[in-house]
């Protein structure tokens, strides 16, 4: 019997259309720079923003924290905007960080059904999320707006815990917040083999790879989940609840 279940956030609880938040950031920076009489070609901004993601991905794999502030400052440097007035630079950084607040992010299909089934079975529910360019405060806001935040007893966001999956410390943090069940009595649902599946399996949890939004392709040295789940409506039965 499972005592606790944790969920990844991106492409497991919520999803965005490909490039959606990237486009919102670019649009915001374009408006700010135009108003400051410092227009920058769109393609140059795209290249700089994509470079910030490359740096993030390197840090993520090395388990080094890399925040949206770091990324925004890198983009400023890539665009050679060092001489901007402080208030304009601050506006750019703020837009980069907070653009997700008003974004139309959507819960993954049937995730509400899965959360209710777990709650009805007496299972404690948590989140283990690797935060990218959108801070955890904003991610919680989307859960709240869609009426899902109350389903969770605890959350472990990397920008608050200070480490990314598959580091066992973030799994330890999550289970400690859920009453410290044995890992064998807990399951983790997520889409990525390297972080979600490998991290959960190495920690002794049941790993469920969710494919309803993104089906992470096989890669050498990366494990498969104990279960593969396409529809959240089937989660409770998959776990035998």
How would you label these PLM feature ranges?
Residues 1-121:
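N-terminal helical cap/lid subdomain that shapes the substrate entry/recognition surface
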